[in-house]
Amino acid sequence: MNAPALRLVPDASPHSTRSTATSEDPALRPVSFDDYIGQTEVIANLRQSVRAAKRGGWQLDHMLFAGPAGVGKTSLAGVIAAELGGKLHVTSAPAIEHKGQLATLLATLGEGDVLFIDELHAFKREISEVLYLAMEDRVIDMPAGKRVIRIQLPKFTLLGATTHAGKLPKPLLDRFGFVWQLRLYTLDEMTTIVSRSAGKLGMPMDAEGATTIARASRGTPRIANRLLRRVRDYTGGADVQGGLVPVHLVIGEGIAQAALAQLGIDHRGLDSLDRRYLALVADRPVGIEAICAELAEDRSTIEDAIEPWLMQAGLIKRGGKGRLATEAGRGHLAEVG
């Protein structure tokens, strides 16, 4: 039997700010509810539930976090585990290829552990069914030759994350005690996150510089932290007007804008692919399949990575005939050329 696809630190090395994999410096992640910025109502409810579970001596209910990629679902799982004092195990549904892998993973859990499964919607139905008994009765059935052995699991909390809650089987969805919807962040929240992360990265930055990067971060902390690292690269090696930018220079609006421009990112966080999308739908409604063909991108990239921010920013709208740029979207195209 293959070893379970399990890791304690969810990390990857994406090649662009559009990747859905996490690449953040662990030092940038919040470590407590007090340290977590944004998602105020969700945090208030979670704080209350965790406090009650600790005081009452019961295990925290299983929870599902739904929302766009990069808005803090993995970070929130880490905070919950830390607040509970339990060990966090992290995996993703695409990494689990058959039922035996998931059963083996569940069998490794200890009393009070927290299991975080990302991209829960990607489970094959027969694999997700293994979770039903585990979540409801804390048991799993393990094959042993021609027999099946039922194994009792310790008390644990499953935290699931998805960008497509509607794709989850209803029996799985119904087994979560809470379903929380995480949203994109406001400009004020993003500015606070950028300022805090810049401090942790040792990057002197003024308020205007933080706001400039926050505006380009598409309401997503993960993107903000990646952009910060690229700005750090820029200040450490860019040639500006015949000389290098001093590494310890305070990063203001001008340097932030120059670094973003070098990356091809405009002041609203749009890159060349976003602008190509916007130009494609500027004059008439276009269906999703035609957009995918024209941009040579798969549907999940269009729907998960491009459209959420364009809609949040009021640059496009979706209707029965397809996607169409708004007046603001056409204005943005005219502004950036």
Which residues does each predicted region cover?
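Pre-Walker A (pre-P-loop) alpha-helix and adjacent loop at the N terminus of AAA/AAA+ ATPase modules
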Residues: S23-P68, A103, E208, I213
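Walker A/P-loop
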Residues: R51-A93, T104-E111, Y132, T163
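Conserved AAA+/SF3 P-loop NTPase catalytic/coupling segment centered on the Walker-B
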Residues: I80, K99, D113-D141, A165-R175
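Conserved AAA+ ATPase core "coupling" helix
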Residues: K167-L201, A207-R215, R226
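The conserved phosphate-sensing helix
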Residues: D206, S217-R232, L249-I251, L270-S272, ...
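C-terminal helical "lid" of AAA+/P-loop NTPase domains
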Residues: T211-A216, R222-G237, R276-A279, A290, ...
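Conserved C-terminal helix/linker of AAA+ ATPases
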Residues: Y234-G264, D274, A325-A328
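Terminal-proximal interaction/regulatory segments of ATP-powered molecular machines
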Residues: A279-G337
